[in-house]
From Swiss-Prot:
Binding-site residues, Fe cation: H113, H117, Y134, D290
Name of the top EC class for this enzyme: transferase
PROSITE patterns: PROTEIN_KINASE_TYR
Function: Required for the formation of a threonylcarbamoyl group on adenosine at position 37 (t(6)A37) in tRNAs that read codons beginning with adenine. Is a component of the KEOPS complex that is probably involved in the transfer of the threonylcarbamoyl moiety of threonylcarbamoyl-AMP (TC-AMP) to the N6 group of A37. The Kae1 domain likely plays a direct catalytic role in this reaction. The Bud32 domain probably displays kinase activity that regulates Kae1 function.
Reactions catalysed, as given in the entry: L-seryl-[protein] + ATP = O-phospho-L-seryl-[protein] + ADP + H(+); L-threonyl-[protein] + ATP = O-phospho-L-threonyl-[protein] + ADP + H(+); L-threonylcarbamoyladenylate + adenosine(37) in tRNA = N(6)-L-threonylcarbamoyladenosine(37) in tRNA + AMP + H(+)
InterPro entries found in the cross-reference section: ATPase_NBD (IPR043129), Bud32 (IPR022495), Gcp-like_dom (IPR000905), KAE1/TsaD (IPR017861), Kae1_archaea_euk (IPR034680), Kinase-like_dom_sf (IPR011009), RIO_dom (IPR018934), tRNA_threonyl_synthase/kinase (IPR009220)
Primary location: cytoplasm
Species this chain originates from: Methanosarcina mazei (strain ATCC BAA-159 / DSM 3647 / Goe1 / Go1 / JCM 11833 / OCM 88)
Keywords in alphabetical order: Acyltransferase, ATP-binding, Cytoplasm, Iron, Kinase, Metal-binding, Multifunctional enzyme, Nucleotide-binding, Serine/threonine-protein kinase, Transferase, tRNA processing
Entry-linked HAMAP family: Kae1, Kae1_Bud32_arch
Cofactor: Fe(2+)
Gene Ontology cellular component list: cytoplasm; EKC/KEOPS complex
The protein's name in its UniProt record: Probable bifunctional tRNA threonylcarbamoyladenosine biosynthesis protein
EC code(s) of this entry: 2.3.1.234, 2.7.11.1
Length: 547
């Protein structure tokens, strides 16, 4: 069978890198990295760097390929990073790709940079259908494939983890890149300093953490603050990866992106996966940062599935979303799907046996009042988290859940009745229901909207609205898992709450547009400010993540 040869060019930010690959091997790769004299990246200077070195990088690449017996005439296509990224850098690389494609008379392939990080990881590890934790300078996302697209389950609501680390490092007087310097100082720490831990469903926020860490430098050593920052931020991203595993039922985690080179982050993810019986995969460090090979290989997959673009369609997209791409190269039958299930076939477990092993807690049955079955939710320690972080959030979430679940019920939202509260354990009414992720329909989504409207009217934000946290028992819908709930009447808090649910619809369920429309109808029927909140949801969705 004839080999396919694709030349790929990466240039979204720091690295100008070009490579030639086939289905099975890397023929050659050449990289020139932009290194500013001081501070972070300057988009215009980075673009000037790429323009200065582009011709030389490609010339050297073609020379190395020729040494391996590959001529320019053997190339089948030119792939380039079309976005997301810094506009000036993207335009420079796209221009180089167009000129090369025109001169050789071969097609262009516009590659999504984020998806390229995923595909190089799958190519270079045994991963087949993973939950992907993608953490780079500008991007922090939890992603998994479903029905023709890579779906985003959660992401940063403000700044990418890598940029957050670099921002803190600059403020602390550390040279660029900040991540490796923080990792080195963290190894010399003597104690943990409490810092903000901000998770909203499967979304994250790092800006408050960075600010608090910078302020902590006034009273604590750089080593201790670096250690505390790293332990806190990494625990947050590992937790959202675990939440995605629990929600999807998948059994693999793939780490992608430049921040993934951090040894401590890898250790924490591996510990989490071992505890859940999942497999953890991470490619070699050379494939973690931005590189031409990932663009070339993803371009090859796209080329072989007929996914090329014309010169007119080769404009760059600095805000190119992962879930905007139609993934035409994956065979649907090989991917894991959320199983269909009915209340009649839903599992019924005997007392004492674990009913569910979620990201938050293990759940099992015990005898309750009047001989009825009761459900026990025990927030067990997470080995990947620092002990102080772990005990603090388990204790806080246990208290919060008991209090706000009762408050929600008083507001007319059906929730389980709490029987007993211990430090890390709740005993509550056992609802013989099914998580609606198995059977969600537009009429059911409308009922969800009605419940959330009542919740928001009472001033409560759930904090973890997913279809795993709603149970259908007969004709009645129950809202559960209030560990991340809080009182807040702001548009932003309510908007993020609904945004988390809409992300779940889009990432997990086939008919998500109909589900969103039905939810909006139900939400408007019980919440007077629904239109304002839904407008805020659109704003949140459109916020640039590449910053």
């Amino acid at each position: 069978m004839k080999k396919t040869f694709i030349l790929g060019i990466e240039g979204t930010a720091w690295n100008l890198s070009a490579a030639i690959v086939t289905e099975t091997e890397i023929i050659a790769e050449v990289t020139e990295t932009y290194k500013p004299e001081k501070g972070g990246i300057h988009p215009r200077e980075a673009a000037q760097h790429h323009a200065k070195y582009a011709a030389g990088v490609i010339k050297k690449l073609l020379a190395e390929a020729k040494q391996n017996g590959i001529e320019p005439s053997d190339l089948d296509g030119i792939a380039f990073s079309q976005g997301p990224g810094l506009g000036p850098c993207l335009r420079t690389v796209a221009t180089a790709a167009r000129m090369l494609g025109l001169s050789l008379g071969i097609p262009l392939i516009g590659v999504n940079h984020c998806i390229a990080h995923i595909e190089i990881g799958i190519w270079k590890t045994p991963a087949k259908d993973p939950v992907v934790l993608y953490v780079s300078g500008a991007n922090s996302q939890v992603i998994s494939y479903m029905e023709g697209r890579y779906r985003v389950f959660g992401e940063t609501l403000d700044i990418g983890l890598g940029n957050a680390l670099d921002k803190f490092a600059r403020g602390a007087g550390l040279p660029h890149p900040g991540g490796p310097k923080i990792e080195a100082y963290a190894k010399e720490a003597k104690r943990y300093i409490p810092l903000p831990y901000v998770i909203k469903g499967m979304d994250l926020s790092f800006s408050g953490l960075s600010t608090a860490a910078s302020e902590a430098l006034r009273k604590a050593s750089l080593e201790d603050v670096c250690y505390s920052y790293q332990e806190t931020a990494f625990a947050m991203v590992v937790e959202v990866a675990e939440r995605a595993l629990a929600h999807t039922g998948k059994k693999e985690v793939l780490l992608a992106g430049g921040v993934g080179a951090n040894t401590r982050l890898r250790e924490m993810l591996n510990e989490m996966c071992e505890a859940r019986g999942a497999k953890f995969y991470v490619p070699e460090k050379r494939f973690m940062g931005d590189n031409g090979t990932m663009i070339a290989y993803t371009g090859l997959l796209m080329y072989k599935s007929g996914n090329t673009i014309s010169l007119e369609d080769s404009r760059v997209n600095p805000s190119f979303r992962t879930d905007d791409v139609k993934v035409t190269w994956i065979k649907e039958e090989e991917m894991k799907k959320v199983p269909e299930i009915s209340p009649e076939t839903f599992f019924r477990m005997p007392p004492g046996e674990i009913l569910d092993n979620g990201a938050e807690a293990v759940v099992y049955l015990q005898e309750g009042p009047e001989g009825k079955r009761a459900l026990v939710k025990e927030r067990v320690p997470k080995a990947y988290r620092h002990k102080e972080i772990d005990e603090r959030i388990r204790r806080e979430r246990n208290r919060t859940e008991a209090r706000l679940m009762s408050e929600a019920r008083r507001a007319g939202v059906p929730t389980p009745i709490i029987y007993d509260v211990e430090e890390f354990k709740l005993k509550m009414q056992f609802i013989e229901g099914v998580p609606i992720k198995y059977l969600i329909t537009p009429p059911l989504s409308e009922k969800v909207g009605e419940l959330v409207g009542k919740l928001h009217s009472s001033g409560i934000v759930h904090g973890d609205l997913t279809t795993s946290n709603l149970l259908l028992a007969g004709e009645r819908l129950y809202l559960i898992d209030f560990g991340l709930a809080y009182f807040d009447k702001s548009l932003e808090a309510r908007g993020v709450d609904v945004h988390v649910l809409f992300q779940t619809f889009e990432s997990t369920h086939r008919n998500y547009e109909a589900l969103v429309k039905a939810f909006e109808k139900g939400y408007a029927s019980t919440f007077i400010d629904s239109e304002d909140v839904l407008r805020r949801v659109e704003e949140i969705k459109k916020r640039a993540r590449y910053a």
